[in-house]
A protein has these predicted regions:
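Short, compositionally biased P/S/T/A/G/V-rich stretches that sit at domain boundaries
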Residues: 2-10, 20-22, 42-43
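Histidine-centered active-site/metal-ligand motif
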Residues: 7, 60-62, 130-131
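Glycine-centered loop/turn motifs
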Residues: 7-10, 29, 86, 120, ...
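C-terminal edge beta-strand
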Residues: 15-17
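Short, intrinsically disordered, charge-balanced linker/junction segments flanking boundaries
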Residues: 20-21, 194-197
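N-terminal active-site segment of His-dependent metallophosphoesterases
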Residues: 22-105, 187
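Extended active-site neighborhood of metal-dependent phosphoesterases/phosphodiesterases
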Residues: 34-37, 103-194
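A generic secondary-structure signal
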Residues: 74-82, 112-116, 195
Length: 197
């Protein structure tokens, strides 16, 4: 259970809320009535007794790697600590792991945070977003160093790598269903499309 006491330091609670308004711009309105209107009806599928398994999804952790490392650690600790109860079988990270491609400390922070999943034996995959590879410059040096094929190839879900994990696919079988989860990082051209096909 979430308790305020666990999040107060020096009489201050720092709370980061990420959400998107209908316009796809960040929502900055103060929530005073205890709910955030996102025009989505909850169908109850997040109650563990109502589903057989689930995948956790992370994305855009760049600001956590840059400045809010504790939140990045907390996210992955929560996933690991709740994997059994929530039936989490796999984690998907869809990029922007770090904010600045050339800031080593951000990669080290991300490495530590994602290492929580490694240590727990939780299978996961990542891809390089525009922040991770300097967008149009396609600078994959740090991405390859910290999140290249060697990090993942021992996972039992890891299928095949494309150019040192610029792309890869994972194979997952759960609840009588088979999944192919395909990852492809930023700056794709016909060669990458051909590989995915």
């Amino acid at each position: 259970a979430f308790t305020v006491a666990n999040h107060v330091k020096n009489s201050t609670a720092t709370i980061i809320v990420q959400c998107t308004a209908d316009s796809a711009l960040p929502e900055l309105d103060t929530v005073t009535d205890g709910k955030l209107d996102n025009n989505a009806d909850w169908d109850g599928t997040t109650v563990p007794k109502d589903y057989d398994f689930c995948f956790a999804w992370e994305t855009d952790t760049q600001y956590y790697a840059e400045e809010w490392q504790n939140h990045f650690l907390n996210i992955n600790n929560w996933i690991v600590n709740n994997a059994e109860e929530r039936k989490i079988k796999y984690v998907i990270h869809t990029g922007d792991i770090v904010d600045d491609v050339d800031m080593t400390y951000e990669w080290e922070n991300a490495d530590e945070a994602m290492g929580i999943l490694d240590k727990a034996g939780m299978s996961y995959g990542v891809l390089g977003g525009n922040h991770d590879v300097a967008a149009g410059l396609a600078d994959y040096e740090n991405y390859y160093k910290y999140f290249g094929e060697n990090r993942f190839k021992s996972q039992n879900t890891y299928g095949e790598s494309y150019k040192n994990n610029k792309g890869h696919y994972d194979l997952i079988s759960e609840g009588g269903q088979d999944f192919i989860i395909v990852y492809m990082s930023w700056n794709i051209y016909q060669e990458e499309i051909d590989w995915m096909n």
